[in-house]
């Protein structure tokens, strides 16, 4: 009876999450990256290949994971968000899978409930970004590897390797690798596998990884992928950010901060708690935390990658601290009820107005003064994505990171403008204006409309 009640509660919660996620795909655009990726995907869909023509800052795993759903569901921002939302739902199922493998299904429900009370996580489940994908692929890799550790069937190891490769090639993520190695070490230490088994598994890992690279990554072009996504990250490392920027972000998410502090406190309170399976989750969570202290440039949306392992660790630690099962389940049910009500409230109270009045006005003007095949340029890429008037492929991403790191130089920008002769140039959020000598480029343009402040639309003279 208890099992049936648990399954019923979990299924109801997952269904509520699914339907509220579906409703929220029209939530207002707050992240400029959504416009960048929408514009990039539309250019790719028009036959301008990613990396070789269309600048694409994310590694190929992001495109491979989202683009099929983007096309299948309608080639819109909402279709991309829906695809991200479906991947996040798969991640929740992976959490439940892990909790069943570790014979503590209630920790899965607690983890899901807490995740949907943490803005750093749930905001990213419906944002056209790659951070939720990293967590989902790492969770699937962990679940498969735990399954392998129990039954030693090669299929589960291969599945785990595939997902860890997908996580790596989605954002060059290495945060789960130490946990992957630790699980194999524990199997060897417990004499469940031998040295020869380890060697064979390493060979399988290398073979699968090489095959993944040859089949999925190489076709995009090694040089092109390196220049667009890998080189940009090295250039962006020089970005100046405060040393403790991570803690500035955490101060704005009280629950996540409490969970991190609680996890660290409970882990250190009694060290013998840090044994299997806690040690594998602890390794993952701590490794992400350490990396994020030093990682640059670090943005608030990156916290989603930290949230998942920390919540998993906290949920497992709570099991060990509360020997009274009734109290433990009461706490879980309380978190579940709060999260359930929160999801309903957020879905009802969140506006379905995708863009602001100013952005809509700009899009209307863009459509009035340009044709569908005209080239336009804006640093507010949601305007290009939603209007269907796209920039030159090399300017699909006019991000502050590209400009500050000189990945997009003033000379290169000027050459692209001279060659493509865009009909409209729309400086909106200060990024275009931060390009050196940007005003000189506007000598061939006249002011068409002033939306407000620095939000202007310029049209090419003679058009």
What spans do the regions from the language model cover?
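Membrane-lumen/periplasm interface segments of specific transmembrane helices
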Residues: 20, 199-236, 255-256, 288-290, ...
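Extracytoplasmic
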Residues: 174, 219, 338-463
